[in-house]
Amino acid sequence: MTSANDTVNKQAVASAFSRAAGSYDAAAALQRDVGERLLGMGSSHPGEQLLDAGCGTGYFSRMWRERGKRVTALDLAPGMLDVARQRQAAHHYLLGDIEQVPLPDAAMDICFSSLVVQWCSDLPAALAELYRVTRPGGVILFSTLAAGSLQELGDAWQQVDGERHVNAFLPLTQIRTACAAYRHELVTELRTLNYPDVMTLMRSLKGIGATHLHQGREGGLMSRGRLAALQAAYPCRQGQFPLSYHLAYGVIYRE
């Protein structure tokens, strides 16, 4: 399957999220809301061993641990994993890539991965890895962003300089196809956040590490003049600057 993310730069992703580790939780209200919904979709599963794949600062690792799970926290960004470890969010910590999980087959009862797989070069490979490390009878819970996310920002940048400067996300049809090999459920949600100005909007993205990374570029776009041009081009509704997220939540059942 062709991915929208074929040129994703994993080193740039790890570096950006490591730098954002200190400010991530304060900026990550959407991430918390999405993760809490995803957690609720699997919280009744009786399995004990849980992998938090792309754990970030360990916010959800901690929530799962408090629910009695034995949590292994995995992240590509050393800075994020350091914060999770300092917070004693999990029982075990692994530095690694979700597309090459450093675990044996059938090691986990639950694999949880919230707003992570959009950074993968190959979504089917990432899901196959999570399936591999999950025991029969277990579940894989994931959420991701689909095409149409950050649409307003991309459209505004296009007016400024002819380039979109936002990450490419897979169409929902490709996400569905990636899940089709498994017994699964997939639900979607459109969430729009509003900001008082474009600078606040851009800082919210930088605060969670979600700058433009799919071609290895991060930041470097924002002189005062370019910010003014972006704000002038950005759609404003009743004094607010909207940013849309097209979300997909998946539950895959390990046979």
UniProtKB/Swiss-Prot annotation:
The keyword S-adenosyl-L-methionine applies. One of its GO terms (molecular function) is S-adenosylmethionine-dependent methyltransferase activity. One of its GO terms (biological process) is methylation. InterPro entries: BioC, Methyltransf_11, SAM-dependent_MTases_sf. It comes from the Bacteria. The keyword Methyltransferase applies. Pfam families: Methyltransf_11. It is an enzyme of class 2 (transferase). Its EC number is 2.1.1.197. Signal peptide: none annotated. Pathway: Cofactor biosynthesis; biotin biosynthesis. Keywords: Biotin biosynthesis, Methyltransferase, S-adenosyl-L-methionine, Transferase. Converts the free carboxyl group of a malonyl-thioester to its methyl ester by transfer of a methyl group from S-adenosyl-L-methionine (SAM). It allows to synthesize pimeloyl-ACP via the fatty acid synthetic pathway. Belongs to the methyltransferase superfamily. NCBIfam families: BioC. This is Malonyl-[acyl-carrier protein] O-methyltransferase. It comes from Serratia marcescens.
